[in-house]
Amino acid sequence: MPAIITKDFRIHNARQFQESFSEAADTYYLAIGRPQAFADNQAFNDGTDTSPPTPVDDVGQVEYYAYDDLLSAKKIASSDTTLVIPRRDWATGTTYDYYRHDYGDINTAGATITSNSNATNLYDSTFYVVNSSYDVFVCIDNDGDTASTTEPTTKQAAIFSTADGYKWKYMYSLASAEQANFLSTDFMHVSTESTDYSTVGGAIENVKVTAGGASGTNGSYTSVVIRGDGTGGRCTVVVGANAVSSVTITTAGTGYTFASVLASDIGSVVGADIDFIISPPGGHATDVVAELGGFYVMTNTNFTQTESGEFNTDNDFRRVVLIRNPIDSDSAATATESTLDCTKSIVFSGSPGTFVADEKITQSSSGAVGYVIDYTSGTKTLRYIQPQFANQGIDSNGTLTAFTGTDTVTGATSSATGTPTTHDTTPELQHDSGDILYIENRKPVTRASDQTENVKLIVEF
């Protein structure tokens, strides 16, 4: 049975997801992990650091293994989320698509209606732009598929024309904070507020002649009534060489969902095909999210230096993970802390050696194996992870064994040794808790003690 998921459903889901960040029922954390290189020959689909593997959406990878090499997690505030749309910078010499309500429909000739860029739906077409001042405009008409050479800059309610023959409609502007927090190379914030209360639904702002017809009486026919289920629409039709040569909207009308003109009103032309373009429900700029296809959610998270000690700056990371409602192992309840440590740790006594990041550690008596994240000499604290791979977390018997007791721990690279006094084998973020909603593998991101990493996630619905 042919079926589709509509854009309204996608936008509804995006809105609900974005709203959930402000609701008490849910908490979201962005975690970073995978300090070890991808090319470790431990698994199929292992990829490389220069070409990270695509995550696999299976029970093992999502429900279990993704937690094994997490380092730290930071809570995402609702103010750090927004709806976004693909970013399309205006550039001179580019031919933009125009807004059309019926891309993908079949026309009277039996062909699919496509945009100039060959898109078969509105949201894949290039029908809006952001200018150099971060003002967003919808293209109402592209002057017969010609190149745009005049940047739109007029911020007014009415549709306006530029010197290159294009017609534009102002939608909204990105404030300074929105530019700083929700503007990336590929996506940009989309306004959830109406920017024009003067528009009306079902207005006809554009018209295209796809077939001029024949056998008509030449002349200019003014105040031609636009028929359909709306009211008030008028146009001027010019018939030359016995065919329709141009149509100009003189009154946009209101309430249309379909429209046409009578042949008898335009010189009895036979076979003319005139496409009237219907504005969105409520009119242009009334629901900007729906009009521009805002079914993407961006989260914007900054990892500032060590985040009061929870985040490591001596190691790199290759994975970001979005987790909903993880458990805080200290409280055994849904986590609410601003940051969570995802590693295990050992505190040593005496004068231990200096362990180094990314080395294997072992404990001969227990057979435990771990992978060093960092070592703090002042507190004699070593943080480590135990991924389910040999030489990283699995012992020679194929078992993940906990470090325990006071027997010596040895570093394979540094040859450092230390006598444990305490073990914390339960990370603050309880492994295998909550729901992992998003996993992204990246090229290595190297951290530094004076550095802030900004991570933007895009979730598409």
What function would you assign to each model-found segment?
Residues 161-461:
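Conserved, function-critical positions that sit in or immediately flank catalytic
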